[in-house]
């Protein structure tokens, strides 16, 4: 399958340490933790333009970012601290920030929050409404938050404008990831706000290209195995030749997620327990 190129959004000027107004209802405070997996850093979103606000993805354990967040909400009441998933660039600051402002942490039960969230839950505040959308794949507990007033989705790491998302087994699951892409496409959002990088302002073609990329990667893996049995790690140099080599270990994990998906489908079989070095071959 030849997929349409993904129209990545990489034009982004970072503003660290202060709240940046993005829309009438949304501000962002950017953590100074840039890197190959975080782009310019973790963007913590402040939702609401009145006295009471919600905060999404407080971010990494970083005292400077905590101070910036507290300064950004000074004079306001934080009613909810929401977390998309449990990775180290999203979750660690949730508890310290929540305790500092006297607000509950809300997240998937796997993260042991104060209040459990599930698909379809609704969180209401002063002039804003957030609906919970379960989006497993990047992580099993991944949640996204749909803001009804702007028909926008805070997409966490499920969809990022600057890069594809890592899907790393055993937590990451490619079938679940693709199913979650379908759910987001079906919702018809006007804007996606990833935790890393800028917004996706034309979501449908972007999401279609992301899905096409994943299905195309399935085909590339099958073509590689038609030549000879191989492992995810061994396939990386050919399939990710243009990608920063610092990302190759993560790329191997994403290829493993494709191999596990193809094994479920009955197309391939593993010679051992699934891992990045396990050799796979076409079935039959």
Write out the residue ranges for each language-model feature.
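Metallo-beta-lactamase
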Residues: 52-55, 60-62, 129-220, 224
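Residue-level signal for inorganic ion chemistry
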Residues: 25, 69, 196, 221, ...
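Short, structured coil segments at secondary-structure junctions
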Residues: 22, 100-101, 188
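Conserved beta-strand hairpin/beta-sheet module of binuclear metal-dependent hydrolase folds
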Residues: 12, 16-74, 144-156, 161
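Glycine/proline-rich low-complexity segments that form flexible loops, beta-turns, and polyproline
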Residues: 1-12, 25, 113, 138
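Active-site HxH/HxHxD metal-binding segment of metal-dependent hydrolases
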Residues: 39-40, 58-131, 140, 151
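C-terminal regulatory/interaction regions
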Residues: 1-4, 8, 223-284
């Amino acid at each position: 399958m030849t997929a349409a190129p993904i129209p990545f959004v990489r034009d982004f000027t970072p503003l660290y340490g202060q709240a940046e107004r993005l829309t009438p209802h949304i501000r962002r405070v950017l953590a100074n933790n840039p890197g190959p997996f975080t782009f310019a850093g973790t963007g913590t979103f402040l939702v609401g333009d009145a006295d009471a606000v919600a905060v999404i993805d407080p971010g990494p354990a970083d005292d400077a970012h905590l101070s910036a967040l507290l300064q950004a909400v000074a004079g306001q009441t934080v009613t909810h601290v929401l977390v998309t998933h449990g990775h180290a660039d999203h979750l660690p600051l949730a508890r310290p920030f929540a305790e500092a402002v006297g607000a509950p942490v809300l997240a998937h039960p796997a993260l042991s929050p104060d209040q459990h969230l599930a698909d379809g839950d609704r969180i209401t505040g002063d002039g804003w409404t957030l609906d919970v959308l379960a989006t497993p794949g990047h992580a099993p507990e991944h949640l996204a938050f749909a803001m009804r007033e702007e028909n926008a989705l805070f997409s966490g790491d499920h969809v990022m404008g600057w890069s594809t998302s890592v899907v790393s087994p055993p937590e990451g699951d490619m079938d679940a990831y693709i199913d979650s892409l379908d759910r987001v496409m079906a919702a018809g959002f006007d804007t996606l706000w990833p935790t890393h990088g800028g917004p996706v302002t034309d979501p449908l073609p972007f999401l279609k290209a992301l899905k096409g990329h994943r299905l195309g990667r399935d085909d590339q893996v099958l073509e590689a195995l038609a030549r000879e049995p191989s492992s995810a790690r061994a396939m990386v140099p050919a399939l990710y030749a243009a990608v920063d080599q610092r990302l190759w270990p993560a790329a191997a994990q994403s290829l493993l997620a494709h191999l596990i998906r193809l094994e479920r489908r009955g197309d391939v079989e593993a010679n051992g327990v699934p891992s990045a070095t396990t050799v796979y071959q076409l079935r039959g």
